[in-house]
């Protein structure tokens, strides 16, 4: 067994709970959103960001359940960023398969990226921590400024 698998084993039940929250929170009344969400979720990925959140919670002795939602909204922000980046970069493949924008089009991909961002912020608000909102707002703003500079550099 490789070391990453061993690390995952430490928080395997929590990773399952995060995946359940991700699937439930991606549900929409719009079929196209559900199709794109399934395309994204079924694409796999290592879920490194949620893993780090879960490991940090464990290392700090956290005993609640808020870390599950925190891990999910971190993954949502990452996913939204990837959806938008693939459109900006004109990417057609990620992890060996067609990107959402290649399959569903740029407009749908951007709109679902926006949907995923909005769900992330709903989940953050539900945690009820002003500090979490401040940190994540700053991080998201920083991420946007980095991508804006990268885009301007490409032009």
Task: Locate the predicted segments by residue.
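Mg2+-dependent prenyl diphosphate-binding active-site environment of isoprenoid biosynthetic enzymes
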Residues: 16, 23-155
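N-terminal amphipathic/basic leader segments beginning at the initiator methionine
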Residues: 1-24
